[in-house]
């Protein structure tokens, strides 16, 4: 991304620099070492996985359910969500857990609030929140796609909505953390390599975005929104470590999912050699949500692939 293109008084931000080692590792990840085999029994544990009607989110929900967790599968209203629940139940017929649908449209903050109200009317505990859902509007070259509140679609769906969802669930998270070992109640923020390649240098994402985003391509807007997820993950860790909650922004990798559905044939062809099964992304999400090797001391660290935790220089 060019560091100094200007239109009027608005300037494109300078992007951070990704090391070659980081780029290579994220494009060609090592064999995963934290898989569903390492996931412990989760009887009595409650999780929310957003965007779980397909892809990585569905795989993460399946793995949690297979270990007897109660999983709220949060996704947009429509036939895909009940179909996903039926699919997971068929794949794991002997689970002692439960799959609960939770209608969640991240393009409307009013619906986000209603989803939280429904959850808190049913539950008093939440052991893990995986903010997995996202949109990549590659066809929105003119920036016309907006949320119900009028926000640019990537900022609204990928940044503002997960922030509000998590903020409104913080009360039940902190209440649960008081009853659990420190660092075992966790929030996972699914980011991407865009944090390092497109995110604003030393900031990730700033309020300046509302002014400069029209200068950016849809793919750049997506990458910047993912930097926003990283920023929220780090800041949530700082604010709530004292309450015993761990927070991890992660890069699940380049995966075969619905995320790229708006990409053209050439775009998809170029990505094909570096796309991995959604299961791999779910492994990273579960590593961040459950691995005993991570503690409160690691909270806020950037997790990419399995057993790789570090702090990037954005």
UniProtKB/Swiss-Prot annotation:
Enzyme class: oxidoreductase
Active site: 191, 222, 226
Its EC number(s): 1.1.1.-
Chain segments carrying region Disordered: 1-27
Pathways involved: Mycotoxin biosynthesis
Disulfide cysteine pairs (residue numbers): none
Entry-linked Pfam families: adh_short
GO molecular function: oxidoreductase activity
Binding-site residues for NADP(+), renumbered to this chain: 56, 80, 105, 132, 167, 222, 226
Ranges of biased composition (kind: Polar residues): 1-10
Keywords: NADP, Oxidoreductase
Reaction catalyzed: dehydroprobetaenone I + AH2 = probetaenone I + A; betaenone C + AH2 = betaenone B + A
Source species, domain of life: Eukaryota
Similarity remark: Belongs to the short-chain dehydrogenases/reductases (SDR) family.
Physiological role: Short-chain dehydrogenase/reductase; part of the gene cluster that mediates the biosynthesis of the phytotoxin stemphyloxin II. The first step of the pathway is the synthesis of dehydroprobetaenone I by the polyketide synthase sthA and the enoyl reductase sthE via condensation of one acetyl-CoA starter unit with 7 malonyl-CoA units and 5 methylations. The C-terminal reductase (R) domain of sthA catalyzes the reductive release of the polyketide chain. Because sthA lacks a designated enoylreductase (ER) domain, the required activity is provided the enoyl reductase sthE.
Protein name (database record): Short-chain dehydrogenase/reductase sthC
Organism: Phaeosphaeria nodorum (strain SN15 / ATCC MYA-4574 / FGSC 10173)
